[in-house]
Swiss-Prot record:
Belongs to the universal ribosomal protein uL6 family. GO terms for molecular function: rRNA binding; structural constituent of ribosome. Disulfide bonds: none annotated. The keyword RNA-binding applies. It comes from Methanococcus maripaludis (strain C6 / ATCC BAA-1332). This is Large ribosomal subunit protein uL6. Part of the 50S ribosomal subunit.
Length: 182
């Protein structure tokens, strides 16, 4: 089976975005938003030339081919994060006991879930903002992974255990992630 001698992926850098590569660290900056990420894998080179980020690998193996595509996606997400940002929408659902959800500091507090006396909490990751308005929770930020993890933390905090989930459907659920309706 023929083997590619070179894999090369190019990513266009928008006019208002600055990309710096220092060793293995890729830094993407636009205005006040900045994201940094270490991208290190043997045989893979990342550089900038002519307004593009170039990811190259000579005589790649199967794993290196996959990592080149992964790095391309990471850098594209970083560029999109500093320009547009990412937003997840969650919806609060309850049948009998009305939940009270609030965001303070780096935690989301959920009171009166299924009539419980104690407060359930979920961690908010760095650089992520959470807004609660009525029956909707909006999680937004520049780092796609941190926004997704914060939304997952909120959803997991209201997971029903020890009861039939077909009957007890109370909770906070992700209904839209990064523009895709679920």
């Amino acid at each position: 089976m023929p083997v590619a001698a070179l894999i090369r992926e190019e990513i266009e850098i928008p006019a208002n975005v600055n990309v710096e590569i220092n060793g293995n660290t890729v830094a993407v900056k636009s205005g006040a938003k900045e994201l940094k990420r270490d991208l290190l894998y043997p045989g893979i080179e990342i550089s900038t030339e002519d307004g593009k980020v170039v990811i190259e690998c000579t005589f790649p193996r199967k794993a290196q081919t996959a990592i080149v595509g992964t790095y391309r996606s990471h850098i594209q997400n970083m560029i999109k994060g500093v320009t547009d940002g990412f937003e997840y929408k969650l919806v609060i659902r309850y049948a009998h006991f009305p939940m009270k959800v609030s965001a303070k500091g780096n935690t989301v507090m959920i009171d009166n879930f299924l009539g419980e006396k104690y407060t359930r909490t979920a961690k908010i990751m760095d650089g992520v903002t959470v807004k609660v308005s009525g029956e909707e929770v909006i999680v937004s930020g520049a780092n796609k992974e941190f926004v997704g993890q914060t939304a997952a933390n909120i959803e997991q905090a209201t997971k029903v255990k020890g009861r039939d989930t077909r009957i007890f459907q109370d909770g906070i659920y992700i209904v839209e992630k990064a523009g895709k309706v679920l």
